[in-house]
């Protein structure tokens, strides 16, 4: 008979003693259980002790968290959090440097536990740590090592959100900023200092201003030229935080300062083109910087043109002048009147491809793209003048019905690029899809526009398009761009080459190929064959999903991006009856053994799988921290008794794998986008294999007719 659900069997360790095997009744008070354990080892004063996990982060067990204890867990009897906090408080202020160093090491480790952190903070522990840092006394021995542990403990304690970051003093900020600005500082101190400054900026608007005054652009950029990718990552993270929290009127100034210090080229040469693979966190920070840089365009994108603003109208005049040469300006001709000049302007604006020939300023009153489109056109006209003139004159000399309207095309293309690059949207926590080519040029967006407007003109000619085909051409151009971007070209020239290979005929071929599975096999016999094969394919997909769950996946812990990443791992037992999971010190490179995963959930106990906003950990997050990308990757397992295991998948692929696998375990349909894609691919492949012998044979829409009965059956011979 299985034990009651309130009873869990555990092993409890104590240094120098044999472990106790104990059945814990979860209905009993924790203090009573601790007393029983202490009595087993004849330890007095049981109120001085508590239980904590022996493995992983070694978290303390409280009345609130005791329900997480599972059968087979190994626990430790340990000094209670309040007593440990008191002892460490005394030891961190010891006159003996060895004692103080050991205390700081232990404090840095225990501070990750919220139970201990609460006790230590209640004893004004954070104030003690900040004073130690503010004193800046370079002790004769162990100074760097002790300071590193002090900063680690401080960061761990603050990360729990128990006290506000606003409590830190100017002296503390100056001291931390000093470690960042020093030319020769210990790597571990520099890393923690950068992380602390980033957390301050992200968590307090008032601290942002103080830190912005202390940290210079040059100081941060110098840390990008080192060989340590972790330091580079923290430096870019701080740059991103300062960028993100800067008032709108200051962001452009920051961007200009970064440009003067050649931030982009330093990142390109020392990070992206360095001799090291880009780690996940670095890729995320590069993605964030890319998004924030493009977001500087948002103001122009959302600014309408004022038709009465002469300076803005002069830009349109400049576009006309560059295209058609100042010498042909009618105002230079003797005796030219106002009406004649207006007629000439109208003709030129029509040749430039504006929708409103009389007053082209009206074309820029829609947002997006607003004035950003005009900025792009002027950049092309001035920086790539030959290209601009060629496109305009080439189209103005065509037959009317086949001319590609440059003005209208440029406006719509700018809007399209803003949509594709999501200009104006905040960075997503779970994404790391930066594009190296955007770090190869200070005016990457304008250069991208220049490449794509040439692509549009080329595609227009290949399609032999007319004005009525404008939207069709734009759809093809969008497809060409979105097919080229995922290849992540290293330079704009490589991107241009990729677009050249995606000609209109190639797009048609790709579309045709992708339609094969949908359009080629629609006759009733083929449909019937598909329906017969489909269950086999679904079973194959199901087995693949379950096999992937058996291999397991690594998941990043929520809320730890600003510090060293923490991970946990989950995998399905080979008999498909239990989910094993547990914390990890590092992101694993290979398979994690079942033995190293201490926690488990019986599949029979799983009640439901919820996703997105229905997940408990998404409801807990504030609206400011939520974003669409994280919601799309979130899912939770609800299991008895009223417990949850919360996930945020590293990417959409892993999300689909786990949702499908868990659904299959519960006997539900696999409904992810990946299943639909895999089903279509495998069905199409299987159908083609089975129909190889029928190549060039017309398959009828209906079965052949049944012939009439013969007039007699005299041809039948009966053997005697």
Swiss-Prot record:
Renumbered to this chain, motif SH3-binding spans 700-707
Residues that the record marks as modified (Phosphoserine) are 503
UniProt-listed InterPro entries? ARM-like (IPR011989), ARM-type_fold (IPR016024), ELMO_ARM (IPR024574), ELMO_dom (IPR006816), ELMO_domain-containing (IPR050868), PH-like_dom_sf (IPR011993), PH_domain (IPR001849)
Domain ELMO as annotated: residue spans: 311-485
Where does it localize?
Cytoplasm; Cytoplasm, Cytosol; Membrane
Which residues are modified to Phosphotyrosine? 48, 717
Q: Which residues form the PH domain?
A: 553-674
What UniProt keywords apply to this chain's record, in alphabetical order?
A: Apoptosis, Cytoplasm, Membrane, Phagocytosis, Phosphoprotein, SH3-binding
Matches recorded under CDD domains: PH_ELMO1_CED-12
Name the principal localization, coarsely classed: cytoplasm
From the Swiss-Prot or TrEMBL record, what is one GO molecular function term?
A: receptor tyrosine kinase binding
What biological processes does GO assign it?
A: actin filament organization; apoptotic process; cell chemotaxis; cell motility; phagocytosis
Transmembrane segment boundaries? none
Q: Which PROSITE patterns match?
A: ELMO
- In its keyword annotation, does this UniProt entry include tRNA-binding? no
Q: Which Pfam families match?
A: ELMO_ARM, ELMO_CED12, PH_12
| Tissue distribution | Widely expressed, with a higher expression in skeletal muscle, kidney and placenta.
Is Metal-binding tagged as a keyword?
Answer: no
Q: Name one GO cellular component term.
A: cytosol
- Explain the purpose of this protein: Involved in cytoskeletal rearrangements required for phagocytosis of apoptotic cells and cell motility. Acts in association with DOCK1 and CRK. Was initially proposed to be required in complex with DOCK1 to activate Rac Rho small GTPases. May enhance the guanine nucleotide exchange factor (GEF) activity of DOCK1.
Subunit-structure text:
Interacts with the SH3-domain of DOCK1 via its SH3-binding site. Probably part of a complex with DOCK1 and RAC1. Probably part of a complex with DOCK1 and CRK isoform CRK-II. Interacts with ARHGEF16, DOCK4 and EPHA2; mediates activation of RAC1 by EPHA2. Interacts with ADGRB3. Interacts with AUTS2; the interaction is direct.
* Disease cited in the entry: Vascular malformation, primary intraosseous: An autosomal recessive, rare malformation characterized by non-neoplastic severe expansions of blood vessels, usually seen in the vertebral column and in the skull. The most commonly affected bones in the skull are the mandible and the maxilla, and life-threatening bleeding after a simple tooth extraction is frequently observed.
Kindly provide the name given to this protein in its UniProt entry. Answer: Engulfment and cell motility protein 2
């Amino acid at each position: 008979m299985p034990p009651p659900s309130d009873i869990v069997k555990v092993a409890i360790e104590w240094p120098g003693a044999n472990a106790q095997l104990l059945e814990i009744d979860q209905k009993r008070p924790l203090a009573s259980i601790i007393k029983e354990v202490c009595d087993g080892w004849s330890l007095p004063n049981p109120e001085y002790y508590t239980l904590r996990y022996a493995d992983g982060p070694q978290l303390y067990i409280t009345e609130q968290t005791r329900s997480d204890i599972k059968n087979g867990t190994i626990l430790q009897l340990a000094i209670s959090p309040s007593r440990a906090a008191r002892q460490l408080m005394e030891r961190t202020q010891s006159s003996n440097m060895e004692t103080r160093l050991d205390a700081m090491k232990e404090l840095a480790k225990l501070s990750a536990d919220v139970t201990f952190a609460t006790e230590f903070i209640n004893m004004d522990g954070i104030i003690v740590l900040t004073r130690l840092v503010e004193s800046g006394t370079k002790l004769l021995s162990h100074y760097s090592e002790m300071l590193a542990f002090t900063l680690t403990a401080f960061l761990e304690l603050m990360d729990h959100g128990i006290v506000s970051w606003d409590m830190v003093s100017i002296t503390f900020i100056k001291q931390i900023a000093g470690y960042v600005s020093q030319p020769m500082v210990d790597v571990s101190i520099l890393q923690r200092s950068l992380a602390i400054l980033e957390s301050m900026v992200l968590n307090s608007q008032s601290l942002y201003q103080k830190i912005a005054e202390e940290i210079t652009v040059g100081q941060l950029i110098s840390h990008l030229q080192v060989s340590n990718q972790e330091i580079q990552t923290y430096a870019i993270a701080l740059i991103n935080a300062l960028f993100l929290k800067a008032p709108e009127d200051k962001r452009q100034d920051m961007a200009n300062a970064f440009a003067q210090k050649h931030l982009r080229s330093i990142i390109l040469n020392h990070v992206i083109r360095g001799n090291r693979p880009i780690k996940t966190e670095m890729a995320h920070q590069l993605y964030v910087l890319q998004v924030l840089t493009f977001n500087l365009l948002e103001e122009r994108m959302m600014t309408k043109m004022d038709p009465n603003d002469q300076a803005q109208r002069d830009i349109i005049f400049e576009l006309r002048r560059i295209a058609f040469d100042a010498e042909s300006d009618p105002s230079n001709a003797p005796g030219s009147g106002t009406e004649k000049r207006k007629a000439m302007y109208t003709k030129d604006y029509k040749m430039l491809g504006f929708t409103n020939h009389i007053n082209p300023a009206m074309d820029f009153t829609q947002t997006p793209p607003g004035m950003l489109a005009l900025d792009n056109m002027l950049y092309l006209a001035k920086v790539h003048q030959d290209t601009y003139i060629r496109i305009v004159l080439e189209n103005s000399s065509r037959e009317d019905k086949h001319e590609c309207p440059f003005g209208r095309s440029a406006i719509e293309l700018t809007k399209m690029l803003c949509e594709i690059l999501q200009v104006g949207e905040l960075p997503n926590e779970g994404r790391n899809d930066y594009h190296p080519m955007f770090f190869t040029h200070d005016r990457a967006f304008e250069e991208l526009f220049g490449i794509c407007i040439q692509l549009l003109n080329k595609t227009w000619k290949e399609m032999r398009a007319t004005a009525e085909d404008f939207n069709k051409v734009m759809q093809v151009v969008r497809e060409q761009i979105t097919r080229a971007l995922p290849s992540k070209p290293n330079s704009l020239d490589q991107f241009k080459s990729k677009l050249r290979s995606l000609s209109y005929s190639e797009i048609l071929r790709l579309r045709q190929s992708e339609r094969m599975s949908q359009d080629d096999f629609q006759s009733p016999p083929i449909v019937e064959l598909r329906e017969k094969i489909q269950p086999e394919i679904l079973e194959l997909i199901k087995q693949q999903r379950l096999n992937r769950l058996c291999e397991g996946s690594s998941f990043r812990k929520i809320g730890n991006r600003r510090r060293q990443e923490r991970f946990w791992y989950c995998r399905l037992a080979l008999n498909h009856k239990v989910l094993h999971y547990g914390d990890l010190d590092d992101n694993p490179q290979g398979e994690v053994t079942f033995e190293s995963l201490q926690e488990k959930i019986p599949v029979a106990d799983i009640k439901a799988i919820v996703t997105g906003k229905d997940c408990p950990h998404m409801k807990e997050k504030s609206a400011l921290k939520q974003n669409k990308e994280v919601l799309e990757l979130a899912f939770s397992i609800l299991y008895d008794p009223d417990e949850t295991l919360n996930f945020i998948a590293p990417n959409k692929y892993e999300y689909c794998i786990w949702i499908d696998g868990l659904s299959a375990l519960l006997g539900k349909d696999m409904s992810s986008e990946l299943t639909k894609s895999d089903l279509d691919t495998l069905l199409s492949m299987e159908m083609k294999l089975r129909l190889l012998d029928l190549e060039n044979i017309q398959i009828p829409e209906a079965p052949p007719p049944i012939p009439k009965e013969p007039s007699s059956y005299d041809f039948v011979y009966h053997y005697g």
